[in-house]
Swiss-Prot record:
Gene3D superfamilies found in the cross-reference section: Mitochondrial carrier domain (1.50.40.10)
InterPro entries, sorted: Mit_carrier, Mitochondrial_sb/sol_carrier, Mt_carrier_dom_sf
Bilayer topology annotation: Multi-pass membrane protein
The Solcar repeat ranges on this chain: 13-115, 136-220, 233-318
Location, primary (coarse class): mitochondrion
Cellular localisation: Mitochondrion membrane
Keyword Transmembrane helix: yes
Designated name of the protein: Probable mitochondrial thiamine pyrophosphate carrier
Amino acid sequence: MIITTSNDEDKKTNVFVELAAGSFSGALTRFIVAPLDVVKIRLQLQRTQLNNNSNNNNKIIGKENVNYRGIINTMSKVIREEGIRSLWKGNFSAELLWVTYAAIQFSTYNEIIGILDPEYRKHQQRTDKDKPNYKPSSSITMIGGASAGILSTIVSYPFDIIRTNIVNNHNKTNFKQTFKTIIARNGGYSNLFSGINSSLFQIVPQMGFQFTFYETFKFISNKYTSSVNNNNNNPLNQFTCGLLSGAISKFLVLPFDVVKKRLQVNEKVGYGMKSCFRDLYFNEGGVKAFFKGGTPGIVKAGLAAALSFTFFEQSKRILLNKQ
């Protein structure tokens, strides 16, 4: 006979709460940041054409021939040419992506940190306003964030591929059509994981940095605000810390995001990360090519992290209080 301890029950409950809170957070966050995501993808995927002239320093010169320029220009052009609903293009697959990703990410992160640092688990289970300020070590949060990023990326990646291809298609299309088109290419079902190496190169450090920055900023913020309002569940603190952690970590890995998006819509067999890096550098303007869509990408990442952390922390607190 197996005896279930109250500790085991609490652990199970906590995992389900984190999955539910993560799913809710992912769904709501995605809906809000969808327009910025569409703008970012359009900017990242457009090919920059430069003339082949060069000056005495062997630098490429000439005017860039591009369709989209900046957030406002791209957003207004997409609305004008494709309608305002196109800012939520591919939203079904994107919602599946974000719900799956956020649920796995938050629950995995908290489980790993809880194993490596039992004190953190005790702290997370407390919902009272008087709980003490606590931060796990940066090495532990880096491991937890990176591990959560790996697992959530692998599980949700096919939805990311489908979403990117839908957004890249200027004509009307849907989830089913796009799925069939992707697997009909050379490579079949493996195309649903095209560019995953670049994605993991991006996501491992990004999530490691993001959770580490978030825990650090939150600890500092709570240290100075909890003495004033006696509340380290302050949503404004969570939003601000999430905004900073998301924007900084995204900037650090932006080149890998550009390469990942290019590989996701690529139809050439044998065209990998190395070839993509080389083409971007030599054919599309050097180093700056790796920061295409950088502004909307960083703004979106900051806003997404701010909303995601806030929605997760607040919904988790509500769910735990209801038990």
